[in-house]
Structure formats: C-alpha cells, structure tokens
Amino acid sequence: MGQSPSPRSPHGSPPTLSTLTLLLLLCGQAHSQCKILRCNAEYVSSTLSLRGGGSPDTPRGGGRGGLASGGLCRALRSYALCTRRTARTCRGDLAFHSAVHGIEDLMIQHNCSRQGPTAPPPARGPALPGAGPAPLTPDPCDYEARFSRLHGRAPGFLHCASFGDPHVRSFHNQFHTCRVQGAWPLLDNDFLFVQATSSPVSSGANATTIRKITIIFKNMQECIDQKVYQAEVDNLPAAFEDGSINGGDRPGGSSLSIQTANLGSHVEIRAAYIGTTIIIRQTAGQLSFSIRVAEDVARAFSAEQDLQLCVGGCPPSQRLSRSERNRRGAIAIDTARRLCKEGLPVEDAYFQSCVFDVSVSGDPNFTVAAQTALDDARIFLTDLENLHLFPSDAGPPLSPAICLVPLLSALFVLWLCFSK
C-alpha cells in the first residue's frame, strides 16, 4: 500500500518537524485536560428532579411539551455549552464524542431549540441533612454502562469478519472474496488498528489465507496503556506482546483482557472501554478474525484512514468476480458443495465461500473456517435477520452518509487542533 499524503500546514507548505512536534504536544496536552466527565456529572445533577427513577432523557410528567420537558431542554442547552467549552481539550476522547452526538439526538427528540435559557449551575457544598448519596458517575472505562447512562438506551454495534481465502464481511454487510496478498488494514481508527497478512497456502498455490494478524489497542487516558497483540499460524498467544493479559496499571486496566477458550486455537480479547470484543481462531493452518465493535468507535477515523476492509470491503480491483470464483480448482465444485453442505445447510455467502475455499485449496478442512465465522456472526450480530447474506457479485455500494464520515471526522480533528 502507498503511504498516506504528508500533512500540510494551513498555508499549504509542508510543516517543519519542529512545528509538527509542537502541534502534537499541544494536542496531547489538551487531550489530558478534557473535562467531559464534569459536563456529564453536571447534566445528571441538573436532571435529577425531572426523572422519576428513569434515565436522564425520560422526563417525569407533562410529556414533551410539559414543564419537565422545558427543564430538560434547559439542561441540554447547558450540557451543550459545557461540551463546546471543553471541545479543544477533548480531541479523540470517546466519551466526549458520544456526549455530543447524544445531546443532538435528545434535543431533536424533545423538540428543544438551540437558543434559550440554560439550567442554573449545580449547587456546591456539603450535602444537606437527610439527602441521599450523590449519583454515581459511570465508569469511564465501561463503554456500555457510560453510553446507557448518557443516552438511556443500549449502544449500537457493528460486526466484521475475515476468514478463508480471504473473505471479508464488512460493517455494512458487504461480502467479498479478495485476491489480496501481503498486509492489509481491516481496521484503522482513533482507538484500534487491525492488520491481516495473507500469503499462499503453499508454493505455487492459487489459494491464499490469513497467516498473521496484528492488533494495536491505542493508549486511552485513564483506561489502558497501548497494547499490541500479534498472532501467527501455529502461534496464537494468550497474552499481549509485552507478556501482560490486561490493559496495564492504569485505573481502568482491567477493561482490556485476553481469554483463551481453547489454547492455541481460539483467543478472545475484550475491550470494555471501547465496547469491543474480538475473536481470533486458527483452523486448518489459517487464521480468522471476527469483531463486534461499538458504532462510535468504528466511525472514529479520518480521511487518511479510509482504506479499511471492515469499512469498505475489498477494493474493487482486489475483488474476485463470480466467474473467477466458479473456476475449477483442486476439488470439483460438486464435491466441495457436498462437503460444505454438511455444516452449512443454507446456501448463503458463508456456504459459497466454503465451496470456493475447499475447491481451490483441495483441503476439506477449510469447511471449518466458514462454519466458525458463521457461529461468530450469530453471537455478535444484534439483528439476526442479517445473519445470512446473499450478496450480488459486486456488493452494495456505500451510502453517501457513510462516505462522508471520514471527511467530517478529518475536518473536526483539524478544527480542534487549530481553532483558537
């Protein structure tokens, strides 16, 4: 793959090394001063009287047009003002971006105008006699609990997988068979980097498989130190590269952990701080990758990070057409279909992938990769109606909204770093 374009200064000329270093230091310092938890706490405090034991976006009495709704709108405007004041210091903070999107959703939901009165600041000082305990602030390293407390609902999740020769199921339910060799990024966002390396199953063979997977969990404030996990065929470790099995010594270090369901063939990595679970398997001398990730995390990337197989599927030039997939291989197609049908009765994309892999490789054990990929999808998908895919030859195009995400993310990051 080619290198990403070099960053440019606002005036168009390449910035010097010292300028880049200064900008990185400033942005890093700003990141460490993010006050989003204070904004969250003030919002929860200001809505306590509006709730009857429900979530912050469920006002008590009066409906959307009642007095409680008016109080909620004032609280939301205060919340939005607080996030704007701390925006420059919250670059790359998942809690901040989640709060901004949540405020927008709630203001639309409750028909709140952007202009208007705000809630009074929360009272300071000792608790009054007889008052109950202060509301608990959600653990910043428990993504699902924090999201549910903020939005009053469970977060959305996306699923991606790569297995076999290799086949990719993208976040948007595209299903491609790829001709890729070498290292390709499955994910590359602000929190997570995943790279898969494919090579021929043997010298001169037409079939390629994933032989190596590298995962980088990027440093995240009080939650985890940066951790690297690397798996290769016949070497599926039960620890990160530094020998640890969690996110380090930070307060939220336990929010990243490795578990082994079957040593040497099945590893599960849970990253609760970003609402993510990853399964890596080894079957028939190949690796497979499967992930369930929070939507906010999957979409947190810039224009320079747009080449991600989990986001856009295989590049068009690297996709195998239907005619290429149906060419005769080492095993006859009818024989491969019979072998795959035993474990995959539905003739969906997983079944077709199995037929291709068994036919091209000549190895009946390739049926296991497709079967376990389907099993993982059954676990990870929130909507099982999307379990079985029957894709067209090219796969559905990305919607304009999805294509705009990298551009908008890049503009937002630039604004945070350079606005004054």
Swiss-Prot record:
Lineage: Eukaryota, Metazoa, Chordata, Craniata, Vertebrata
Entry function: Acts as a bone morphogenetic protein (BMP) coreceptor. Through enhancement of BMP signaling regulates hepcidin (HAMP) expression and regulates iron homeostasis.
The organism of origin for this protein: Mus musculus
Gene Ontology terms for molecular function: BMP binding; BMP receptor activity; coreceptor activity; transferrin receptor binding
Annotated positions of the Phosphotyrosine modification: 43
Subunit structure: Interacts with BMP2 and BMP4. Interacts with BMP6. Interacts with BMPR1B. Interacts with TMPRSS6.
Keyword Mitochondrion found: no
Sites marked Cleavage: 165-166
Tissue specificity remark: Muscle cell lineage.
Prosegment residue ranges: 394-420
Name of the protein this chain belongs to: Hemojuvelin
Membrane topology: Lipid-anchor; GPI-anchor
BP term (GO), one: transcription by RNA polymerase II
Keyword terms: Autocatalytic cleavage, Cell membrane, Disulfide bond, Glycoprotein, GPI-anchor, Lipoprotein, Membrane, Phosphoprotein, Signal
Signal peptide: 1-32
PANTHER family: HEMOJUVELIN (PTHR31428:SF3), RGM DOMAIN FAMILY MEMBER DRAG-1 (PTHR31428)
